[in-house]
Amino acid sequence: MQYIIPSNLGWLESKLYPEEIKLLWNYILEANVNAKPNLVGHLHESLYLKDKKNQFFDRTLIQYCSHYAFKFGNQGDKIPTTGQHQMCLESFWVNRMRKYDFNPFHNHFGVYSFVIWLDIPTDYREQYATTEANDGGSASNFEFMYTNILGEITTYKYQLSEESNGTILFLSLIHI
């Protein structure tokens, strides 16, 4: 008897280096262009960030793209184009959230997308304790939603707290 597990795509999870976090905080402090009209969700504030001289892209993101391509294949190869194109950072923004803010399931455009948690305003344990159903729902979670081999909707939850500071790189078309 053999067990067959079909291949599937995944995502990367990694902690940023202190100098990368410092660079992002500097970008956030300088941000002043409203991104909310182009985004979904009930969020306190969303601002576009400017990656000066592509520092964050060149130092951090391109490495994650390479690691992802090594493990799961270069997803950019699947996009029909007339020639080769360099990876670039199309848009970059910060969501400043407060207690009770939320972002509904959505997806992003492009080949790759990422999220970086820098300062989590809540703790999932506290949020779970205050839910009426107390069923460990989705309060203070970050979730991926996808279908399994049977077509059933499946989720993968990140339960967020102060310890969650880190980075995840994931495919743009996966629902979050």
What does each of the following model-derived ranges do?
Residues 1-86, 91-103, 138:
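Non-heme Fe(II)/2-oxoglutarate
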Residues 90-170:
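Catalytic core of non-heme Fe(II) oxygenases with the double-stranded beta-helix
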Residues 175-176:
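Conserved small/polar residues in nucleotide/adenosyl-binding loops
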